[in-house]
Structure formats: C-alpha cells, structure tokens
C-alpha cells in the first residue's frame, strides 16, 4: 500500500552575505557601495522589482572583478536573491537563468540547501517543447528479464480489469498470513496471462531492514511460492520508497537487506527484482545525508528500476504563500507536477542500462484538511499526462501501475473509483495503442520516436507534442503544414 511519507521541511534559507568582509589586497569597486545600499533596502522590504534592479547591476559589476572569497560570496548571494525575486514576480524564464548562474557559486560556497532549491527550479522553470512521431518500432530494447514489447499497465489486484496486462499486489515482509490470497491472485493472473508486480513492503521500514539476514523461513517460503508460477512474469519490488521512510536506515543496511532478498529468488527465470524509489527524497540533514542513489545495490542485483509518480495539487495539503513556494517546486506538486520532470532524474540515471517502471502512480482528485477541495478536472489532466507524456518521452518506461486505493488517513485521495472523471480519464487513455492490452505477451501497436527539425514521411503520419511551460494551466499546440494551420489542440 502507499505509505504516509514524512518529509523534512526546511526554513527559507538566507544567503545575504555581508559585503564588509576583509580580504587582503583587494578593494571592491566604488560603484558597488551605492548599489549595495539600494539592494539592501530592496531585499529587507521584499521589493522584488528593486531587488532585481540593484541585484542585476551588482552582478554585472562584480562579474568582471577578480574571483576571490568576497566577490564569490557577493555573486552567490545576489544571483540567488535575483532568481528568487524573478520567481516571486512570475518571470520563470529569468528565474531559471539566475538560479543556473547561482549553482556553481552555491556549490563552491557549500550552500547545499540553496543548490538543491536552485537545481529544482531550473528543471521546472526551463521551457521544453518536443515533437514526436508515431512508429511501429520500439526505441529502446534492453534484453532484460520480463521485458515486454511496449508498456504494460494495470492497477491493484482487487480492482484489476480483464483488458489490463499487469496487476499490482502487496506483501508485508515476514507475514505469511496473506500467502493464500497471493496464490489466488497469482492463479488468476496466470489464467488471464497478466504480469504481476509484487510490492514486498518492509512494514517497520528501517527496523525491518536491520532484521533481514537471508536465513529466515519467510524468504524460503516466498521463493517456493513464486517458483510454482513459471508462466507468470513477476516483478518483485523490494522495500520500495526507502528514501522517504520515517524509520530510516543507512545505505549499507538497506543494500544488505535488498541483496538478501534478491539472492533468495536468484535463479527463478520468471522473477525480476525491482529497486524502486520515491520520486523525491526526504531533505538531506546531518543525520541523514543521503540521496536515493546511495541505496542502489548494484546492477548484478537489480533487473528493473522503479519510481513512483504521484501528482498532487497541494504539497502536504496546504497553500504555500510567498517565498515558501519553493516547497512546491522541490517536492513536485501543483505546477511542478509534470510527470516527465518528476521522474527525469531516475530515468536519466538508470534508464541507459535498466528498464524503468512506474511502480506506483496516482493523480489526486481530493485534498483533505484545511484545503477541503475536490478538483476532478485537475486530476484527470495530470493522469492523462502520466499515461501519455511518460511513454512518449521515455521509451525506457515499460510498465505503469496505478494505485487505485483510498487511504483514509492520507491528505490526498487517488483512487479511480472515487471520482468518475478520473476513472473515465484512465479508461480512455489506457486504450491508447502504446499500451499492451490483455495478454502480457502481446505487443503494443505503436511507439514514439523524437522528431528532428525535418519530418520525413511516406503517406500519413501521426505527430504528438510534449510541451512543458511552468505556470500554465493549459497549453495550445498548433500544427502547420506549408504555412497552413492544420490542427490545434484546442480544436
């Protein structure tokens, strides 16, 4: 099941550095001091226009000066503040420009939090527009275990539909009481020729990890059960979302546990191991200074890499005002819910050598708490993006599983059967030809290839577009042939 995640919020960092540092044999230009006085007044009063005005002048002035501790501090703080001022003013293009300018200074100065914020803002604020062309050939083949020819899709086992090509079920490590139900679901999958993603959760998270040694009866009994389903492609997802656990563990502890589970099913030709992360990690701290990548067990133990993809209109069920809005950017909610950007790091890091699955996904139609809002249109829009843009942009992704369950204690509800517009959006988009229908051994009827500056075709062709424009509720794409408008996405 989807877990409640605890994420450490950070207070808004202040990067305003005193300009009165003493540096031997160097004096700041005389013009700096007047500009700095105006800049200080602007930042203290949160006058973003004047922060930009004075900040840009200071950046231009100091950029031509020798690089030393003082000038680097000035450039680091001013580029960050100018970027944030553009962010607050809604000028995301210039915000991205100055955040990108800030990053090398922030790294040099050890301003880790600022660098994380800046890198996320650059990813979100940079506009992207790519065109794709329909093709009959897969654009990425790994030769991996249980690799399909297209994109498998499905949902939790108790809601599965006959036309879906995979199903998702859950086991809790150490608990064999559900093995009977698991066998029943595997029997059903075998009869219907569905692939199965088994989410082997670690119920006590880090505590469970520390108690796994590979010699307990649970693992031997699990292997025995899975070995009887040789005709069912099984994706064993081991200890998922480790990077947002409340009861944390170290990378060494997790890797040891993962290897123990992976070794227990090695040699089973139908079982592929899956290492699966949450799309965004808990914030780094002195006590937990890790990224998801630190927990990777190694290629020899991992057949597939998974990542979750949950679209939520509000981060932690609240509205973030003013400068605290960076939380929405860093934790990928609201306008930052673009699924392509959400999983970008995972695909780019591992998709060159491992097939990728969206091991769980959902689009929130309901936000509880102080928000108390239902927005079916928003949820349907982002569900369609998950199921269209991800297969379009990332041929590395070969499985998408929807978490069709309602967790009453969660801030957000994602269940398809809780909202008719969301359910209809799922039904419609999963009929698309890039999904494998019914039997998991079938092939998709269509794939995507990225179009170049010139499109060559013999007869008809189908074009698709992926636009990413931060802060836009809707984007209209127009297609022209020989200067004539032939199609608009709004018509």
Name each region found by the language model.
Residues 28-36, 117-181:
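Boundary/entry segment of secreted carbohydrate-active catalytic domains
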Residues 114, 128-155, 234-235, 354-446:
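Substrate-binding cleft of secreted/luminal carbohydrate-active enzymes
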Residues 162-172, 292-333, 357-359, 363, ...:
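Aromatic- and acid-rich polysaccharide-binding/catalytic face
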Residues 175-279:
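Substrate-binding cleft of extracellular glycoside hydrolase catalytic domains
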Residues 182-197, 201, 310-368:
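Glycoside hydrolase catalytic-domain groove-lining segments
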Residues 262-291, 350-367, 397-405:
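Aromatic-lined carbohydrate-recognition surfaces of secreted/lumenal glycan-active proteins
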Residues 446-491:
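Long, low-complexity serine/threonine/glycine- and acidic-rich segments characteristic of extracellular
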């Amino acid at each position: 099941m989807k877990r409640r995640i605890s994420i450490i919020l950070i207070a808004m960092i202040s990067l305003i550095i005193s300009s009165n540092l003493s540096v031997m044999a160097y004096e700041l230009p005389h013009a700096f001091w007047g500009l700095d006085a105006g800049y200080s007044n602007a930042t203290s009063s949160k006058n973003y226009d004047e922060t930009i005005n004075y900040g840009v002048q200071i950046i231009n002035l100091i950029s031509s000066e020798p690089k030393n501790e003082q000038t680097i501090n000035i450039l680091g703080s001013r580029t960050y503040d100018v970027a944030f001022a553009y962010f607050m003013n809604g000028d995301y293009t210039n915000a991205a420009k100055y955040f990108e300018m800030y990053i090398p200074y922030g790294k040099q100065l050890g301003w880790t939090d600022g660098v994380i914020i800046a890198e996320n803002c650059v990813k979100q604020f940079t506009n992207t527009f790519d065109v794709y062309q329909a093709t009959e050939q897969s654009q990425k083949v790994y030769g991996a275990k249980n690799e399909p020819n297209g994109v498998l899709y499905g949902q939790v086992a108790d809601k599965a539909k006959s036309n879906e090509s995979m199903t998702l079920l859950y086991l809790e490590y150490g608990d064999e009481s559900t093995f009977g139900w698991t066998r029943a679901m595997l029997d059903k999958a075998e009869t219907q020729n569905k692939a199965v993603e088994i989410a082997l959760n670690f119920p006590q998270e880090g505590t469970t990890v520390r108690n796994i040694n590979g010699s307990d009866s649970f693992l031997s009994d699990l292997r025995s059960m899975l070995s009887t389903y040789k005709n069912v492609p099984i994706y064993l997802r081991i200890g998922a979302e480790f990077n947002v656990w409340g009861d944390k563990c170290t990378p060494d502890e997790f890797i040891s546990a993962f290897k123990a589970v992976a070794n227990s099913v090695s040699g089973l030709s139908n079982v592929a191991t899956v290492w699966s992360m949450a799309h965004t990690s808990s914030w780094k701290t002195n006590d937990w200074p890790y990224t998801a990548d630190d927990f990777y067990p190694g290629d020899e133990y991992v057949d597939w890499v998974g990542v979750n993809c949950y679209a939520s209109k509000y981060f932690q069920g609240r509205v973030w005002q003013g400068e605290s809005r960076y939380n929405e950017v860093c934790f990928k909610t609201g306008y930052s819910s673009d699924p392509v950007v959400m999983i970008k790091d995972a695909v780019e890091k591992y998709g060159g050598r491992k097939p990728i699955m969206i091991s769980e996904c959902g689009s929130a139609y309901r936000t509880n708490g102080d928000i108390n809002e239902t927005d079916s249109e928003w949820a349907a829009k982002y569900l369609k993006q998950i199921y269209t843009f991800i297969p379009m942009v990332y041929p590395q992704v070969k499985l998408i599983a929807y978490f069709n369950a309602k967790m009453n204690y969660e801030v957000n509800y994602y269940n398809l059967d809780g909202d008719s517009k969301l359910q209809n959006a799922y039904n419609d988009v999963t009929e698309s030809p890039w999904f494998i229908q019914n039997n998991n051994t079938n092939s998709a009827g269509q794939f995507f290839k990225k179009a170049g500056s010139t499109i060559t075709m013999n007869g008809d062709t189908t074009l698709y577009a992926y636009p990413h424009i931060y802060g836009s509720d809707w984007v209209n794409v127009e297609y022209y042939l020989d200067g004539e408008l032939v199609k608009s996405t709004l018509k």
